[in-house]
Amino acid sequence: MRYERLAPEAIPGALRDLDGWSLSEQGDAITKEFSFDDFAQAFGFMTECAIIAEKMGHHPEWFNVYRRVDVRLTTHDVGGLTGHDLKLAAAMDQVAKRRV
């Protein structure tokens, strides 16, 4: 599947529709830190998101320490952000809301 890179002027509006996501310093990715009650909640979040990401064919860069999960989303094939990143970010937000 081929994805179109988002125009730089479209990114601020797209971020307004997401909860707590930020544009990376390089401007080629969005990032968010998720925080949970404990490691089991954090790992459960990652497990559920991994299944969604696999079905989408789009995989996050992420890092987990205890109850925190740091996520970075970008589309490597186009060297920047696409609608696919926004879709996965929204799905991850929904998973996190169910785990609070």
Curated annotation (Swiss-Prot):
The keyword Lyase applies. Keywords: Lyase. One of its GO terms (biological process) is tetrahydrobiopterin biosynthetic process. GO terms for molecular function: 4-alpha-hydroxytetrahydrobiopterin dehydratase activity. Its EC number is 4.2.1.96. It catalyses: (4aS,6R)-4a-hydroxy-L-erythro-5,6,7,8-tetrahydrobiopterin = (6R)-L-erythro-6,7-dihydrobiopterin + H2O. Pfam families: Pterin_4a. Belongs to the pterin-4-alpha-carbinolamine dehydratase family. HAMAP family: Pterin_4_alpha. This is Putative pterin-4-alpha-carbinolamine dehydratase. It comes from Allorhizobium ampelinum (strain ATCC BAA-846 / DSM 112012 / S4).
